């Protein structure tokens, strides 16, 4: 295909060629230590062979054909080099000290504008050592994006999602809710759809709860430790198949609490008869355990369970231990409560302490028991079942006999006294 060029376009091209020759002479004088004949011989056939394929291959090969790059920069990919001089319609294939070869692409009058627009970027990447090293580093990190623009685009377009615990219900057909317990998504080795399966539970990544990872510098300052740990462990997904952030921002579920299997609960200690003595120390109702029953009491298994102190409600996961009393303790406490009027008064403090020491319960437990068993105040304690109450005032004299015996006793008192006097006289 032939293109018609006007005279003013040819004049502009000649001026550009002269300017380029002067610039390249200066560059070659400043960086002649990087130019080698072997590199030039290797790059010229590449340009000549790629010129017949397509304009894109022309641009790729032309970016490599400049003899100003050091030999150790062969890691730069063609796509990165092409991005350093994107869309240029006026490309130089190779230049020697005495000859120059020029490749022209169809562009017409826009050649001068594109040449002027992309000249700083081309000189910045290919002119000096620092620019070449920066371009190679960015091209390797950005995955072929090339140049500063490619690196920034890869970092800006990468989705910042973090996939946490698996929410797949494995018992949905049965009408139940069963989770597998997977705490975080781990990508499987491989490419494509195989990488979207969790290596821990085998479920697809869409079953895992998704949350935004690091969205702003403010969040980095709030939690730098967690962000660095996540980046080190590779928990942030950077796959190209992920949905952009703005597309699903309205579909995020406001999960305020973790799933039931992720919530931390206090350990539940099983309460058994063997561990009952150990649980007495944690009881909120008493300080002293009732003494063990002797084997002579056959009704020891019929001990009633009474309510304990309700000062502070215990936790829902821990069963509160209730104080157990024997039948003898209940009868003695009932008899004592009848004597004091089912209330503990301050004047009776000494008697209450003495009774608690005898029965084997604390004052607090006795007070709670009297409060919970006020309904027993209507029925007095039975005299047959209760033991004899301890006498409050000890009287050494025996009880007086009945009246008729007392009269008979007075009637026979003088003979007894007389007999005692006779015995003393005989002695």
UniProtKB/Swiss-Prot annotation:
This is Zinc-finger homeodomain protein 7. Residues 50-60, 271-283, 301-312, 417-427 have a biased composition (Low complexity). GO terms for molecular function: DNA-binding transcription factor activity; transcription cis-regulatory region binding; zinc ion binding. The gene is ZHD7. The lineage of its organism: Eukaryota, Viridiplantae, Streptophyta, Embryophyta, Tracheophyta. The keyword Zinc applies. The homeodomain differs form the typical one by having namely 4 instead of 3 extra amino acids inserted in the loop between helix 1 and helix 2. The record marks 370 as: Required for DNA-binding. Homo- and heterodimer with other ZFHD proteins. InterPro entries: Homeodomain-like_sf (IPR009057), Homeodomain_ZF_HD (IPR006455), ZF_HD_homeobox_Cys/His_dimer (IPR006456). One of its GO terms (cellular component) is nucleus. Its main location: nucleus.
